[in-house]
Amino acid sequence: MKLKYVFVWMVLLLSSISVYAQPKNTSHASQVWLAYFNQTRLSNKWGLWGDFQLRTREELVSDLSTGIARVGLTYFVDDNVRLTLGYGFINNYPANDNITVSQPEHRPWQQVQWFTKNKRTRLMQYIRLEERYRKRYLSNTELADSYSFNFRVRYNILYQIPLHPAGLVARKLSALINDEIHVNFGKQIVNNYFDQNRLFLGLNYAFDANNNLQFGYLNTFIQTAAGNQYRNINALRVAYLQNLDLRKGK
């Protein structure tokens, strides 16, 4: 129970920082984030990870900002702890009408994910390390042959609370409180060690034990590489989560 209150206070603190203490030099956007997440267990110890995402740029449905395809190989320490090694390809679409070429990114990643469950609630956390290789721009119309590189670490915590007396059961809604902070590091990082914070408040509908639909409000607060410029994104996030167990007898 104490962990629950610590989490709630942490979310409130991060929300206050991102919403009420925004610097003056902040741009704003409204977006839609769509995603599909899959975790497939192949055996007692091994499984696969896959997620695919698409995000609009502004005014909810105007143009695209980001496309993500990410895969990974997962090792199950036990039913509640998982280690994943993976690769992601990210396509950053032109950020404005003056840029005519997309910026590709190659992103190897490593992750430890763990779950804390009881009869009524569910807590998920992960720490992810990413190695980000992004194509440099020569101009608004041309990419360079070289890449910029930096590390990024992400900490994600999600708390799921049932809205039905029976608890977290199929064909019922539950509430979600989720926060993820991103921190940059590496030789090429000068001004923005803090990268971004994502606060999500939403609902989960469980079709069954393995298929869930999540939807709700996402606030993303980003510090750009310049260090003194920020971006605040208000988004509708919709995600389909599928967990498959291919072990015999499961």
Question: Which residues does each predicted region cover?
Answer:
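Residues that define the transmembrane beta-barrel architecture of outer-membrane proteins
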Residues: 28-32, 65-67, 104-108, 147-155, ...
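Short loop/turn motifs that connect adjacent beta-strands in outer-membrane beta-barrel proteins
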Residues: 42-45, 80, 117-123, 163-173, ...
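Transmembrane beta-strands of outer-membrane beta-barrel pores
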Residues: 52-58, 87-93, 116-118, 129-133, ...
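Transmembrane beta-strands of outer-membrane beta-barrel proteins
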Residues: 48-50, 83-85, 121-127, 153, ...
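Solvent-exposed loop/turn segments connecting transmembrane beta-strands
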Residues: 23-32, 56-66, 187-194, 225-232
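Residues on the lipid-exposed face of transmembrane beta-strands in outer-membrane beta-barrel proteins
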Residues: 36-40, 71-75, 110-114, 129, ...
